[in-house]
Amino acid sequence: LKGMPEPLIEDEIRRVLGLVNLSENLDDKIKSFSGGMKQRLAIAQTILNSPEILIFDEPSAGLDPFEREQFKRIMVRLKKDSIIIISTHIVSDIDTITDDLIILNKGSVIANDSPEALFEHIRGMVWDIPKEDIGLLPIENIYYEDTKSKTISKTKPTPNAVISEPTMNDLYFCGQLDGGVFE
C-alpha cells in the first residue's frame, strides 16, 4: 500500500475487511475482538496486498465451529484469486476448501491427489490403532475395543474390522494415530 493515495488505501482496507466479515468493526479496538475475529484480521493483513500465493499454518486452529465455518467461506472466496497453501490437522478444512491434498510424513510427500481420491483410496482399509492411542479418539468413533490385538474397530466383535464407509474424521483420526503416516 506504500505510495498509494490515502483514499485508495482506505478503500482497499474496507474491501479486505469485507472479505473477512470485519467491515462493521473498522473502528473497533483489537482488544475487543474475539479469537476468531483476531484470526480473520490476521488473514486480512495477509491478503491486503493481493499476493498471488498465500501460505497459512493451522489458520483455523483455536476457532470455534461457527468461526471455522466463516474461515472456510473466506478461504473459498480467496482461492478464486490466489494460490493457497494450508498446513492443517483439521480434516473438515481439507474437504471443504482444498482442490489438492498433499500428505507429508517427516518432510516427504507420501500422497498427492484430490481429497476425494485420497478418501476413496482409504475406503475399506483396516486401521490398527495402538491401545495407548485409543483415548485420543472421539468417543463416538469407538464401537469395539479388542484388548488382545490392541486395536479398535467400527463393528463388533471383529478384532480388525474394515471401515466400509469412512468419513474424513476416520481419515484424520486414523492418520493422527498411525505414527505420522498421514501427517
Model-derived features: positions:
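Catalytic Walker B motif of ABC-type/P-loop ATPase nucleotide-binding domains
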Residues: 54-58
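Hydrophobic anchor residue at the start of the ABC signature
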Residues: 43
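Conserved ABC ATPase signature
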Residues: 29-33
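Conserved ABC ATPase "signature" region
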Residues: 8-25
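C-terminal coupling/interaction segments
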Residues: 140-183
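ABC transporter nucleotide-binding domain
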Residues: 70-151
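Helix N-cap at the start of a conserved alpha-helix in ABC-type nucleotide-binding domains
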Residues: 65-67
